[in-house]
């Protein structure tokens, strides 16, 4: 981090010459995002003193000491806005974070047992978030690590590229559901915990706990398990509350500097919307591809206007169904809003935008298996409207083979100097059942270069070892 810097320049003028002293003291405070502003506060003192001189009766010398303080005042960092995506036409394998390849380590170097990983980025860094069970592998606390909700779960993070071990991880708050985002100046962290019938959303801005939001349907209030989205200092968070096998209506919270300033109630097809993966289609619109856990294998698709703070939900019309389990592609008949069959159950899906000057690309991920959380493929559709376009999405490569686990997936964008890099992350779960540890690796694919997606990802973990 870079600083407010104070420089004091003292110039002593004497009859015999010039003595220049420069005193510099610097302290680091925050990141410099634009040119330094200068402010001068002059201090002038002019004492008179008599100098020894051979002919003192005829000469009087005056020493004038002039002091000028120059104070460098740094501006606050700027709010972030979505930019055009960096150039590229395909995604490639960028990174694998497979903590349990280091499972022989003990103590502070032991990998944490985690699930629901996601990544969020600020102007200068990305953080890898997850929900831990407050246990490590190896260890003696494996019981309960397959549970979604309990009193031990916490939202943690490491710098992207670090392994989430005991010593590397920052524990942000108690939470069994989470999100986070950076507004350009500071991190906003979201955690949900509490009893199923009365869960609570907690907000942390930087190091301060700033606000809460209470359950409105008394049925597992929860959030998106991926990054929230910020523009001009306003951050938008998707939440939902309701039955996993019935009605669960979502809302959006508009948050500024850690405090809720508005609730947004979507209209349209609102029966069940959860675990949305959201991003900016433009400076005006946030779009989200979500999960319906009860009625359909199509993804509910949200459009949120950040100028009017209004949101509408409809089902995606494409014949490429993105949830798991799902029926055969193209088998659902009727209008776009038809639910079809095999709608029970679901999975969070990856979604990210490629913003270009003349068009927009929407990239999605789905499991290779129609019935199991195995494998992960990448798809893309340029331009058009997800609410009305019934065409199939174009397959763009295999990120995880059908022999490997492919659970939740999510989107995020890395900030380059002049553009944003779209990426998709995949949760690869080591499912040991209820008798042993249950944790995850994270595979990351990002837009870079041209050609075809070349290689899939494996975790390299054998739970029997």
Curated annotation (Swiss-Prot):
Post-translational modification remark: N-glycosylated.
Gene Ontology biological process terms from the UniProt entry: carbohydrate metabolic process; viral budding from plasma membrane
Species annotation: Influenza B virus (strain B/Memphis/6/1986)
Protein name: Neuraminidase
Domain comment quoted from the record: Intact N-terminus is essential for virion morphogenesis. Possesses two apical sorting signals, one in the ectodomain, which is likely to be a glycan, and the other in the transmembrane domain. The transmembrane domain also plays a role in lipid raft association.
Swiss-Prot/TrEMBL keywords: Calcium, Disulfide bond, Glycoprotein, Glycosidase, Host cell membrane, Host membrane, Hydrolase, Membrane, Metal-binding, Signal-anchor, Transmembrane, Transmembrane helix, Virion
Named cofactor requirement(s): Ca(2+)
Head of neuraminidase as annotated region, ranges: 88-465
Organism phylogeny: Viruses, Riboviria, Orthornavirae, Negarnaviricota, Polyploviricotina
Ranges facing Virion surface side: 35-465
Membrane topology: Single-pass type II membrane protein
Database matches in CDD domains: Influenza_NA
